[in-house]
Amino acid sequence: MRTSQYLLSTIKEIPLDAEVISHQLMLRAGIIRQLASGLYTWLPTGLRILRKVENIVREEMNNIGAIEVSMPIVQPANLWLESGRWGQYGPELLRFTDRSTRQFLLGPTHEEVITDLIRNEVKSYKQLPLNLFQIKTKFRDEVRPRYGVMRSREFIMKDAYSFHTSQQSLQATYDLMYYTYNTIFNRIGLDVRTVQADPGSIGGHLSHEFLALVSNYEDQMLLIDASHKATERNLPSENLQLVDAPGIYTLTELVKLFNLPIEKIAQIIIVHAQQNALYPLVALMVRGDHSINYAQVEKLPQVASPLVFATEDEIRLAIGVGSSSLGPINLPLPLIIDHSVAVMSDFVAGANIDGKYFFGINWERDLSLPEVANLTNQNISVSQPQRLHRTNWIEVGHIFQLGSKYSKVMKATVQGEDGNNMIMTMGCYGIGITRVVAAAIDKYNDKQGLLLPVSIAPFQVAIIPINLHKSLLVQTVAEQLYNQLSIRKIDVLLDDRKERPGVMFADIELIGIPHIIIIGDRNLAVQKIEYKNRSNGEKKLMNLSIIVDWIVAKLNS
């Protein structure tokens, strides 16, 4: 791409109505322009970033076998009346009537539409499980749009919906989506925390939010750093792995099979909750070599007194697996952990799938630290039980186990293995694409402008030719490098404007192109060009003959 043929709409001044850094930079760098309150046009530079985020999401969805579809943003009211959400949603649902006086809405979500589609297209259990996704514009009539695209009325979202014949099948897909989301956010370069959340208006019985840390936003959370006088929690040294261990029913068998120290295993005990509690059962987690202290546990306000342990049947009914495979990740019950568990790292626990275990679990990386209490007979001395710090965050992803919330009321059934009709079990999984862009810009910037990772930068390489329109040599070399990089499928922007070098540098650095090639007569006289790394400011002279191969190798690495 050449700047002479491109809409590079940069501005110098910081817009007065932009409250947060991401909104300021998105306006200054020519990424978005406001059309009306909460409505934005995406300019070419912004659209390039947006498409790269979409492509990362699409690639990872394809990698796990999800199938892409496209559903209308305009939805008939009758589907929402059928599900019951027409009356539950407030004024944020934009409703309208067509010329035939039929009621419609602009969809903020697509649970009803996808459920209607699948109940008409899928007839047998043999066609399940199924995971469908789309990347689509949504609309929510926010009462007070703010912070640019962080809280706008129109937004782009990746939403996926899975259909199953059992809770165990749903749990397997839920776990897969959970880790796929972490892969997506890692590729984009976001610092994301995962917390168990209220399903809200979407519904269901279990959900997790993916929260990106940002510099300034109205939503806040407390992060807990737990430390232990005798055993400081170590930094993660292992990757999270899902390991098969069929036929294992006790800690002793698990220790023998994998030659594990028992203190590296965390076990979960399920007990009855207080009467009238939201959940009938509560999960307690202790180290493998520790036992719970009945008197201590009975003091907990969530737990029934006297203490009653859940039966194997109660556990399987509530969670879908036996007690030997219980673990903290995606556990659909309130969880309280012992102080000794709070300082564990790279530990082992069940995966909430029969015969499967997670190895290398770490708090805050793989799941948020839940409530911590003294559950055991151990006399633990904690020097700093809780170090709290408040941070700003924005939700960039949310996954839900919907169960039969929509399929039951909308009669979405398939013929089961026994020949009888059965209600499908559902999950749904969302990523806010436009919010992800804003969160990434919030994280990656400096006083010059954007510092986006190569994976989502609008261009990979910029060529700045000094005195392009006065030097035939500079013009020739600039064209050669531009063509060579383009042939190698590198996203390159050639700044061929009749502008001063200072203006070109300011614009290229503002929009955040990570690799910059500077061409000038003085360096060309000795067959050299200058290279600048946008992220760390590194500059060096390089041989003209190797620059293309060197850039390509750097990008591929």
Swiss-Prot record:
<dbReference type="Pfam" id="PF00587">
    <property type="entry name" value="tRNA-synt_2b"/>
</dbReference>
<keyword id="KW-0648">Protein biosynthesis</keyword>
<dbReference type="GO" id="GO:0005524">
    <property type="term" value="F:ATP binding"/>
</dbReference>
<dbReference type="InterPro" id="IPR045864">
    <property type="entry name" value="aa-tRNA-synth_II/BPL/LPL"/>
</dbReference>
<dbReference type="GO" id="GO:0006433">
    <property type="term" value="P:prolyl-tRNA aminoacylation"/>
</dbReference>
<keyword id="KW-0436">Ligase</keyword>
<dbReference type="GO" id="GO:0002161">
    <property type="term" value="F:aminoacyl-tRNA deacylase activity"/>
</dbReference>
<dbReference type="InterPro" id="IPR004154">
    <property type="entry name" value="Anticodon-bd"/>
</dbReference>
<dbReference type="GO" id="GO:0005829">
    <property type="term" value="C:cytosol"/>
</dbReference>
<keyword id="KW-0547">Nucleotide-binding</keyword>
<protein>
    <recommendedName>
        <fullName>Proline--tRNA ligase</fullName>
        <ecNumber>6.1.1.15</ecNumber>
    </recommendedName>
</protein>
<dbReference type="Pfam" id="PF04073">
    <property type="entry name" value="tRNA_edit"/>
</dbReference>
<keyword id="KW-0030">Aminoacyl-tRNA synthetase</keyword>
<keyword id="KW-0067">ATP-binding</keyword>
<dbReference type="GO" id="GO:0004827">
    <property type="term" value="F:proline-tRNA ligase activity"/>
</dbReference>
<comment type="function">
    <text>Catalyzes the attachment of proline to tRNA(Pro) in a two-step reaction: proline is first activated by ATP to form Pro-AMP and then transferred to the acceptor end of tRNA(Pro). As ProRS can inadvertently accommodate and process non-cognate amino acids such as alanine and cysteine, to avoid such errors it has two additional distinct editing activities against alanine. One activity is designated as 'pretransfer' editing and involves the tRNA(Pro)-independent hydrolysis of activated Ala-AMP.</text>
</comment>
<dbReference type="InterPro" id="IPR002316">
    <property type="entry name" value="Pro-tRNA-ligase_IIa"/>
</dbReference>
<dbReference type="InterPro" id="IPR004500">
    <property type="entry name" value="Pro-tRNA-synth_IIa_bac-type"/>
</dbReference>
<comment type="similarity">
    <text>Belongs to the class-II aminoacyl-tRNA synthetase family. ProS type 1 subfamily.</text>
</comment>
<comment type="subunit">
    <text>Homodimer.</text>
</comment>
<dbReference type="InterPro" id="IPR007214">
    <property type="entry name" value="YbaK/aa-tRNA-synth-assoc-dom"/>
</dbReference>
<dbReference type="InterPro" id="IPR050062">
    <property type="entry name" value="Pro-tRNA_synthetase"/>
</dbReference>
<dbReference type="InterPro" id="IPR036754">
    <property type="entry name" value="YbaK/aa-tRNA-synt-asso_dom_sf"/>
</dbReference>
<keyword id="KW-0963">Cytoplasm</keyword>
<dbReference type="InterPro" id="IPR044140">
    <property type="entry name" value="ProRS_anticodon_short"/>
</dbReference>
<dbReference type="Pfam" id="PF03129">
    <property type="entry name" value="HGTP_anticodon"/>
</dbReference>
<dbReference type="InterPro" id="IPR036621">
    <property type="entry name" value="Anticodon-bd_dom_sf"/>
</dbReference>
<dbReference type="InterPro" id="IPR002314">
    <property type="entry name" value="aa-tRNA-synt_IIb"/>
</dbReference>
<dbReference type="InterPro" id="IPR033730">
    <property type="entry name" value="ProRS_core_prok"/>
</dbReference>
<dbReference type="InterPro" id="IPR006195">
    <property type="entry name" value="aa-tRNA-synth_II"/>
</dbReference>
<dbReference type="InterPro" id="IPR023717">
    <property type="entry name" value="Pro-tRNA-Synthase_IIa_type1"/>
</dbReference>
